[in-house]
């Protein structure tokens, strides 16, 4: 037969229940828990008592949404656009001694025929008259340079060794410039002689030709045009030969 727990009824059941609860109270209650409790937190219908020694502190943290953060950053940032090109302010003419020289140089090389004594057509024109004119201009510039150096030498002449050194340096510079201009003139003369020699050689070849039709070769025509035609502005190149 199966055994069943005894059943209690009436006053007897009440007495047994009271004794059972008192026995449980003695087992789960200590002397330390007899102190006054500060607060009770209710979580899912379970009562938890907190002692006085363990206070609970709460802090509030505000978490911004990403859109709010972006708006705040955009509002706080100030975008300053840098210029693509920066220009230096020019010094006043009183403080910059090279302003006048700079302006004169620009005016000389800005294709202004009144200021510049050389043009592209004149440089490429290798006729006799043009080369002679260029040599005349070289001589004129050389005279100006010599006069300027002579003036500086006289101005710097003196008893001190420093002034003597300046004078010697200027004289050496003058001689160097004279030599450069002289070499340029010699190169021009050599070129004219070479062109004349080539023309003569082409002419001799044509005189030896026994064919009925006599005409100049392309090279001879080129040389003849350069040496005799004053209006020609053609130049020779290595491909012509």
Curated annotation (Swiss-Prot):
It holds the Pfam family Pneumo_phosprot. GO terms for molecular function: RNA-directed RNA polymerase activity. Residues 199-241 are annotated as: Disordered. Residues 227-241 have a biased composition (Acidic residues). Residues 1-30 are annotated as: Binding to monomeric RNA-free nucleoprotein. Keywords: Host cytoplasm, Host-virus interaction, Inhibition of host NF-kappa-B by virus, Phosphoprotein, Viral RNA replication, Virion. One of its GO terms (biological process) is symbiont-mediated suppression of host NF-kappaB cascade. GO terms for cellular component: host cell cytoplasm; virion component. The modification Phosphothreonine is found at residue 108. Signal peptide: none annotated. Changing residue 100 to R: In strain: ATCC 51908. Residues 232-241 are annotated as: Binding to the N-RNA complex. InterPro entries: Pprotein_pneumovir. Residues 81-87 are annotated as: Binding to host phosphatase PP1. It is found in: Virion; Host cytoplasm. The keyword ATP-binding does not apply. The modification Phosphoserine is found at residues 116-117, 119, 232, 237. Residues 39-57 are annotated as: Important for viral particle assembly. The N-terminus is important for viral particle assembly. The oligomerization region is central. The C-terminus part contains binding regions for the RNA-directed RNA polymerase L and the nucleoprotein. Belongs to the pneumoviridae phosphoprotein P family. Plays critical roles in regulating RNA replication and transcription through its interactions with multiple proteins. Tethers the RNA-directed RNA polymerase L to the nucleoprotein-RNA complex. Recruits the M2-1 protein, a processivity factor that is required for efficient transcription of viral RNA. Acts as a chaperone for neo-synthesized nucleoprotein by forming an N-P complex that preserves N in a monomeric and RNA-free state and prevents the association of nascent N with host cell RNAs. Recruits the host phosphatase PP1 to inclusion bodies to regulate viral transcription. This is Phosphoprotein. It comes from Bovine respiratory syncytial virus (strain A51908).
């Amino acid at each position: 037969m199966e055994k069943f727990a005894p059943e209690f009824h009436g006053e007897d059941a009440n007495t047994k229940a009271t004794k059972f609860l008192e026995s449980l109270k003695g087992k789960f209650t200590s002397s330390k828990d007899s102190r006054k409790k500060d607060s009770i937190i209710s979580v899912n219908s379970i009562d938890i008592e907190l002692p006085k020694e363990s206070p609970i502190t709460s802090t509030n943290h505000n978490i911004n949404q990403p859109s709010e953060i972006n708006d705040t950053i955009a509002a706080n940032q100030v975008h300053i656009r840098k210029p693509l090109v920066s220009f230096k302010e020019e010094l006043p003419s009183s403080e910059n001694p090279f302003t006048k020289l700079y302006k004169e140089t620009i005016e000389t090389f800005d294709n202004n025929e009144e200021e510049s004594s050389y043009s592209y057509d004149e440089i490429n024109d290798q006729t006799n008259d043009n080369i002679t004119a260029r040599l005349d201009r070289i001589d004129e510039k050389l005279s100006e340079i010599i006069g300027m150096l002579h003036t500086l030498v006289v101005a710097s002449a003196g008893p001190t060794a420093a002034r003597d050194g300046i004078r010697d340096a200027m004289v050496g510079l003058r001689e160097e410039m004279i030599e450069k201009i002289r070499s340029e003139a010699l190169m021009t003369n050599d070129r004219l002689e070479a062109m004349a020699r080539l023309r003569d050689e082409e002419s001799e070849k044509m005189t030896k030709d026994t064919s009925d039709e006599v005409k100049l070769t392309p090279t001879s025509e080129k040389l003849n045009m350069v040496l005799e035609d004053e209006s020609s502005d053609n130049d020779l190149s290595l491909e012509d030969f």
